[in-house]
Amino acid sequence: MQIVDRSNLEASLKLALSPENNPKRNFVQSVEIIVTFKEVDMKKGDLKLREIVVLPKPPEKTKKVLVVPTIQQLEYAKKAEPNTILTKEELQKLQGNKRAIKKIARQNDWFLIAPDSMALVGRILGPALGPRGKFPTPLPNTADISEYILRFKRSTLVKTKDQPQTQVFIGTESQQIADLAENALAVLNVIESKGYAQKVRNIYVKTTMGKVVKVELR
C-alpha cells in the first residue's frame, strides 16, 4: 500500500516552501516530514521505529559524523572526511571534561564507533548523547570504512519516542521539490515496510521555521 501519491507530496512541499508559508530567513532551513499515527498505544509498545534511512537525494550540506576508528581504520576514516575523528586515546582524555563532551555531542549527528571502543564511548559520551536522542553505532570490523561513513553522511533517522509520531529531516529548502519528494518517499517506504502504513493518521511537511502543510493521503 502506497501511503501517498507523489504528486500530492510534491504539491504540499511546494506549498510549504512558498513565501506565504516559509518567509525568507538568514540561514538555509531544513525540510522535515511529520507522520502521525492512530490506534496505537505507546505504553504497550504498539509503535516502535528507529530506522536509519539513506536519502537518495542528499543535500549539499551533509550530516555531521563523529568516528572513533581502530588504528587499522584510521586512514580510511580520514578519506571519508567526517566532521570529527577521535582515536581511543583522545576519547579517554575527554573523561571528566563536560564542556568538551557536550560540544562534541551537540556538533555531531552520527557517532560511528569501533566495537572495542563502544563501552568507553557509552561511559564518556553517553550522558551527553542520551538527552539529545543520539546514540553510538558500531563500525564494521573491515579496515576500509570510508563508504560506511559516507552512507551515514547521507542518512536520516526515523524514530518514535513517547508520542505517536515521527518528525524526520528530508533535506533543505535549497533543494529541488522533486528531490525532497524522493527523500520523503524513502522515509515513508520504511514506515510501510515495518507494517505501519494502515496506522498512519496524517502526514505534514514543513521547514524549520515555516508553517506546517498537510499532505493529502491516498
Swiss-Prot record:
PROSITE patterns: RIBOSOMAL_L1
Keywords: Repressor, Ribonucleoprotein, Ribosomal protein, RNA-binding, rRNA-binding, Translation regulation, tRNA-binding
GO molecular function: rRNA binding; structural constituent of ribosome; tRNA binding
UniProt KW tRNA-binding keyword: yes
GO cellular component, one term: large ribosomal subunit
One GO-annotated biological process of the protein: regulation of translation
Pfam families cross-referenced by the UniProt entry: Ribosomal_L1 (PF00687)
Domain of life, per lineage: Archaea
InterPro entries linked: Ribosomal_uL1, Ribosomal_uL1-like, Ribosomal_uL1/biogenesis, Ribosomal_uL1_3-a/b-sand, Ribosomal_uL1_arc, Ribosomal_uL1_CS
Role summary: Probably involved in E site tRNA release. Binds directly to 23S rRNA.
Stated family: Belongs to the universal ribosomal protein uL1 family.
Record's subunit section: Part of the 50S ribosomal subunit.
UniProt name for this protein: Large ribosomal subunit protein uL1
Record organism: Saccharolobus solfataricus (strain ATCC 35092 / DSM 1617 / JCM 11322 / P2) (Sulfolobus solfataricus)
Lineage: Archaea, Thermoproteota, Thermoprotei, Sulfolobales, Sulfolobaceae
